[in-house]
Every structure is written in structure tokens, then in C-alpha cells.
């Protein structure tokens, strides 16, 4: 079999096991796909994200990172809300552009591209700005391959 290259933006390396898994045709209407992959993934994500998974759900989005970020910001931040964006580079700045496009009220805390977001600084900022209803940040960046939290 001819080896294929996975061409995506960013410095992404793809292991042989991932390439092998990609060779399987998963149909979105198949029970195996929906029950054994999608539902399990949603359940696992809830287990990571909250201590009370019965109060929340997850929605999987297929698209670029910017597509997913815009979908979440556009669908969850209302005109009466205020968003705090913790920006540590181009992706965080892009969230500001998205918020402006949707005419949303937001503040932005700027951190260096290779700097972790300071939990203490954000906590202090939130304590002094009670009008903020939502917080957003990029937890990992493809260009730098760093985790920021």
C-alpha cells in the first residue's frame, strides 16, 4: 500500500497507528460509530471537564480550530454577556476578532506566546470585574506545541 501524507496546518506528526485507523470507513449513521465511538468520547470528555457530568453535555464539532472556536463563541456568548479572552498568541487574538465580528462585549488579557496563563492574575482580574460571564483561552497551540494551563 502506498503511504499517504496527512496534510494539515501546523507541525503535526502522524503515527502509523493513526494512519491505520484512518483507513477504516466510519459511517455516521452506523450504530458502531455512534454508540461505541461518539457516545464514549462524549462521556469521556464530560468526565474530564466536570465533576457533575449529569448536568452537562458535549457537542462534537468537525472543522478547523478556528471554526470550532467561532461556533462556540457565536453560539454561547449573548449580547448581555461579557467574555474574558486570555490571549497568548495568534489564536487568542483571533478570538478577539471573532468577538468583534459578533459585536460582543469582551476584555482581553495578553500573555506572551510562550508564557503560561497566570491563574492568579486571571483570578484577580475576575475578582475585580464581576461583569464577566465567560472565559476563553487556548489550552494548547500547534505552532509552539505548548500547553498553556
Locate the predicted segments by residue.
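Hydrophobic anchor at the start of a short beta-strand
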Residues: 58, 83, 106-107
Amino acid at each position: 500500500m502506498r503511504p499517504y501524507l496527512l496534510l494539515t496546518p501546523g507541525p503535526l506528526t502522524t503515527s502509523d497507528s493513526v494512519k491505520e485507523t484512518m483507513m477504516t470507513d466510519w459511517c455516521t449513521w452506523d450504530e458502531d460509530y455512534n454508540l461505541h465511538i461518539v457516545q464514549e468520547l462524549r462521556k469521556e470528555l464530560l468526565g474530564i471537564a466536570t465533576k457533575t457530568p449529569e448536568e452537562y453535555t458535549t457537542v462534537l464539532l468537525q472543522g478547523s480550530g478556528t471554526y470550532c472556536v467561532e461556533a462556540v463563541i457565536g453560539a454561547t456568548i449573548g449580547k448581555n454577556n461579557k467574555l474574558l479572552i486570555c490571549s497568548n498568541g495568534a489564536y487568542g487574538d483571533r478570538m478577539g476578532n471573532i468577538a468583534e465580528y459578533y459585536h460582543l462585549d469582551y476584555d482581553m488579557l495578553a500573555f506572551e506566546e510562550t508564557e503560561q496563563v497566570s491563574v492568579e492574575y486571571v483570578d484577580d482580574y475576575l475578582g475585580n470585574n464581576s461583569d464577566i460571564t465567560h472565559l476563553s483561552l487556548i489550552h494548547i497551540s500547534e505552532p509552539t506545541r505548548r500547553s498553556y494551563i
